[in-house]
Amino acid sequence: MPGATGAGVSFGVNAAKALEDGKIDGFWANGMGAEVAVRRGIGTMVLDARRGDGPKAAFGYTFPALATTTALIERSPEQAAAAVRALVKTQGALKANVNLATDVGRKWFPEFEASLIADVVARDLPFYDPGISRETFDLMNRFALAMGLAKQSARYEEVVAVQFRDLWKQR
């Protein structure tokens, strides 16, 4: 979708705008994109995979992830570990005080979207998990193959930085 890439661009917010402008008929995006479309009255939620809509396997098609390169992990493992610790700490802080999301949202989103972020985060908090299980990975891997996004299966250990597994549990 034009305009949906680049630093600081929210795919979901951009998708909701494209829907509002009549450039697209629908989208599959994050909670913020769906929330914007529903609250503005320009869209409806058809499926919410995290809440059991659609095939059971669809639950594994959508989750937040922190991505980096193998090169960075090999070159600066402590930097990668620090990023994981920051993610775990942030998820814990949001679980303790979801309104922190609004404070941060004001720095990244337009005013309307920033006003929604605490509601979106609160709804998704039960699904916040800093780790990616083998089962979730397998579901995503099958989805990527079925959609033609990957040509061959990947191995869990090739994609998920399991060397940081112990950090996932620290809260």
List each language-model region with its residue ranges.
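A local structural motif
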Residues: 1-10, 14-25, 114-116, 150-156
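Pocket-lining segment of extracytoplasmic ligand-binding domains
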Residues: 14-107
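Short loop/turn and capping residues at structural boundaries
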Residues: 30, 48-49, 117-118, 155-156
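Conserved C-terminal helix/tail region of periplasmic/extracytoplasmic solute-binding proteins
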Residues: 142-171
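Secondary-structure end/capping motifs
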Residues: 74-151
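Residues that cap or flank secondary-structure elements
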Residues: 7, 25-26, 132, 139
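Short secondary-structure boundary/hinge segments and terminal tails
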Residues: 36-37, 54-56, 123-125, 160-164
